[in-house]
């Protein structure tokens, strides 16, 4: 650019009409619009007043909603008019780049830093090259670096402006902590502002302004995040920076274990939001993750490293010398958590779980019985060898109903194999532990590993060990011969509760329990019964099983029925007693006789079966010709059983008609 004399031409006519104020207003408009040619022409038409007009002061309506004293250079710097700024600073000494004409005492650098334009970085570079001083304050004592406004369209310009104008945040503490390990510091308080990544990676300027972290008064009500329940694995994984803070006053967020509005360390509850420890690829992009809280990936380093599958699964490099307030890693072998491969959750470390204050844990809702506890990780830890058996027994008691084998889960062909395996196992229980065989099921019968024959003994042993009825000194004698009958009773009771179809009692009329017939779907088909066509479900069968056993507790036949189970080849006699049938027909309470089920036809079937004990009489009954020719009926008892079943089915058919 040439000097001002190169722009001045001798006008052929007098200057344009209008006063000096109007001409300065026109120059300010041209400077705001970055009209280089128009500004050059306006200065040329000014003649001898061109120098005064180039550095003249006019009134400009700014952001303060008032007229402010501004020069064309200051207006051009505010709106990022790099062409006009280059023209004006090239005029030599005619334009003062450090001039402060207004009452606010702002310079051209103040206007460029607070303008928020896309070309703010280029304008600041032109002003600094022309001799602008970034250490000149305004009337309020603010430097150009204190009034920086980042352009919304280019957030990276913030760091460049800070470097050019000499502003540098004091990140020494955070940088030293982050460089020593992969565990980042806690998010800063809102007074520290937001900073882009480019501001941390840029180099230091010779002129630095050290502004440390805001000091807060000592708050004794803030909990210590490194002691008590706040340092436990349970709180760190499921409550740290998850629960909102209830304090309504300003305090240090880095010392508070709860989350605050707008905090970067905010986490989702892994018990309510099923996400993994894998970082989300869209979280750091402009606009954030479109899935929001429903995303299956972690949002931020705190969600990733405090996830139950990641927290304290590795050893810290500093070990016991670690000085971080919140560390994501274990500092010794006792704090190390072992996560199973088939589980998305983690296991509590022995030291952390034993050091939890139970009163505080109950208040925070971290105990297993708390209503707010929705997540229950498996309690067995490989590192906790001393209490692993008791924890495993406690877990098995809660999951037995979910993991036990059910008869309706198997095919019809597999029921015979199940009966054969059960008889072998009951026989093996009567043998000494050293000589017990290990029966195996066929590959076609799919039973979950939780009740495999190899660990069924341990399951019931741990169950009895956890019961208050068995003291600790009797833990080794649970499988003595004195406890065999109690164990067999427990096996059959659990089988009757878990299976809606009792496979051991469905093929013989001797196994017909009158109470079960009264409540069975076959008994409901009879028009004599008030329970006609009542739908049945597995739940009703399980609930009704203990009720059907109550009337026969004191029965002599029932009390001696287990006498023949001791042998592997023993057969249980589930025959129907006529006295029990009489008691069933008799009303239990006055006024309820009309609700009792009529089972008189069952007694008639049993009496017919006892009278027709001879083969000649059996042959005379209808529907038995096909049964007589079967080669698999070896004795008279089996033939009699099949005959009674046929008569029973015919009676049911007649009842339906």
Curated annotation (Swiss-Prot):
GO terms for biological process: regulation of gene expression. Keywords: ANK repeat, DNA-binding, Metal-binding, Repeat, Zinc, Zinc-finger. Residues 549-562 have a biased composition (Polar residues). Transmembrane segments: none annotated. A zinc finger (C3H1-type) spans 274-302, 311-333. ANK repeats lie at residues 68-97, 104-136. Pfam families: Ank_2, zf-CCCH, zf-CCCH_AtC3H23. Gene3D superfamilies: 3.30.1370.210, Ankyrin repeat-containing domain (1.25.40.20). Residues 176-222, 507-566 are annotated as: Disordered. Residues 176-206 have a biased composition (Low complexity). One of its GO terms (molecular function) is DNA binding. InterPro entries: Ankyrin_rpt (IPR002110), Ankyrin_rpt-contain_sf (IPR036770), Unkempt-like (IPR045234), Znf_CCCH (IPR000571), Znf_CCCH_sf (IPR036855). This is Zinc finger CCCH domain-containing protein 50. It comes from Oryza sativa subsp. japonica (Rice).
């Amino acid at each position: 650019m040439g000097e001002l004399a190169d722009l001045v031409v001798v006008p052929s006519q007098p200057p344009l009409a209008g006063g000096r104020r109007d001409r300065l207003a026109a120059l300010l408009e041209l400077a705001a619009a970055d009209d280089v040619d128009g500004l050059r022409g306006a200065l040329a038409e000014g003649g001898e007043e061109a120098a005064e007009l180039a550095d003249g002061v006019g009134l400009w309506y700014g952001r303060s909603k008032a007229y402010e004293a501004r020069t064309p250079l200051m207006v051009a710097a505010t709106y990022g008019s790099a062409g006009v700024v280059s023209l004006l600073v090239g005029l030599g000494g005619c334009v003062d780049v450090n001039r402060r004409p207004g009452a606010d005492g702002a310079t051209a650098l103040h206007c460029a830093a607070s303008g928020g334009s896309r070309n703010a970085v280029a304008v600041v570079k032109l002003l600094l090259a022309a001799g602008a001083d970034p250490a000149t304050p305004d009337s309020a004592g603010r430097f150009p670096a204190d009034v920086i406004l980042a352009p919304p369209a280019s957030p990276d310009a913030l760091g460049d402006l800070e470097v050019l104008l000499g502003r540098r945040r004091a990140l020494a503490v955070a940088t030293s902590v982050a460089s020593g390990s992969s565990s980042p510091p806690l998010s800063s308080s809102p007074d520290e502002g937001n900073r882009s990544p480019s501001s941390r990676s840029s180099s230091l300027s010779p002129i630095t302004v050290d502004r440390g972290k805001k000091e807060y008064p000592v708050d004794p009500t803030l909990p210590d995040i490194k002691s008590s329940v706040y340092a436990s694995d349970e709180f760190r994984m499921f409550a740290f920076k998850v629960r909102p803070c209830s304090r309504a006053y300003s305090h240090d967020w880095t010392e508070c274990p709860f989350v605050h509005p707008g905090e970067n360390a905010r986490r989702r509850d892994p018990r309510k939001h099923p996400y993994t420890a894998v970082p989300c690829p869209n979280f750091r992009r402009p606009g954030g993750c479109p899935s929001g809280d429903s995303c299956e990936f972690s949002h931020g380093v705190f969600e990733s490293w405090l996830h139950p599958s990641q927290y304290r699964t590795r050893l810290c490099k500093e070990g016991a010398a670690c000085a971080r307030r919140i560390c994501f890693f274990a500092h010794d072998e006792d704090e190390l958590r072992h996560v199973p491969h088939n589980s998305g959750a983690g296991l509590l470390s022995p030291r952390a779980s034993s050091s939890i204050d139970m009163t505080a844990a109950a208040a925070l809702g971290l105990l297993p019985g708390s209503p707010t506890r929705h997540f229950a990780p498996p309690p067995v830890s490989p590192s906790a060898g001393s209490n692993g058996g008791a924890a495993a027994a406690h877990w098995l008691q809660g999951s037995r109903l979910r993991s036990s084998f059910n008869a309706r889960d198997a095919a019809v062909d597999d029921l015979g194999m199940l009966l054969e395996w059960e008889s072998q196992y009951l026989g093996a229980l009567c043998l000494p532990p050293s000589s017990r065989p290990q029966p195996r099921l066929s590959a076609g019968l799919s039973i979950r590993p939780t009740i495999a024959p190899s660990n069924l003994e341990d399951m019931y042993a741990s169950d009895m060990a956890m019961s208050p009825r068995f003291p600790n000194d009797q833990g080794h004698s649970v499988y003595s011969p004195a406890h065999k009958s109690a164990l067999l009773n427990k096996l059959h009771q659990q089988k009757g509760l878990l299976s809606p179809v009792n496979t051991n009692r469905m093929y013989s009329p001797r196994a017909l329990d009158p109470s079960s017939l009264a409540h069975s779907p076959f008994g409901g088909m009879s028009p004599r019964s008030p329970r006609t066509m009542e739908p049945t479900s597995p739940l009703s069968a399980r609930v009704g099983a203990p009720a059907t056993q109550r009337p026969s507790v004191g029965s002599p036949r029932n009390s001696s029925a287990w006498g023949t189970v001791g042998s592997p080849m023993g057969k249980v006699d589930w025959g129907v007693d006529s006295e029990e049938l009489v008691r069933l027909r008799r009303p239990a309470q006055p006024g309820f006789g009309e609700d009792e089920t009529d089972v008189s036809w069952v007694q008639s079937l049993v009496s017919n079966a006892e009278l027709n004990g001879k083969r000649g009489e059996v042959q005379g009954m209808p529907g038995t010709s096909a049964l007589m020719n079967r080669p698999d009926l070896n004795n008279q008892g089996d033939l009699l059983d099949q005959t009674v079943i046929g008569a029973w089915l015919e009676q049911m058919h007649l009842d339906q008609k």
